[in-house]
Amino acid sequence: MTLFVDDDDKAYHIYSSEDNSTLHISQLSENYLTHSGKYKRFFPSKFNEAPTMMKTSSGKYFIISSGCTGWNPNAARSASAKSIFGPWKELGNPCVSRDSLTTYYSQSTYILPVQGIKDAYIFMADRWKPENPIEGKYIWLPLKIRDDKLVELEWKEKWDLSIFNN
């Protein structure tokens, strides 16, 4: 699950529900402490979890999530919408390089906007180690937006914020 605060200061709780079969977006109250009662179900029976959300400067929303395979890594899933409540369009796996079918052996956890750089985002993910959970790690990768239509994640052994200047 994740929380997302839109540029109008409205907050949303995005989570997997119905035995992990369906994602929900629920608007929170003005003080962010309870659900407002306004919500939307999407991708019923698709079994997504670990949703993350971002909004581009053009106003388009993107979600990256994971399939429900327990400790086993799987291909990420992405979707876009012009409104937070949809309709949402499935875009497929945003990962484009080696180990893309395992989301680089990780699962989405958050998308961090880079302050001071327009439409620059960092994809943050958990890398689980079921045999020794204390050894779990995190990966951070630059997230590219292609023509405001697709998001793309490419594995980088090393990178810094200058990657967003290209």
Regions found by a protein language model. Name each.
Residues M1-N166:
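Carbohydrate-active catalytic/glycan-binding domains of CAZyme proteins
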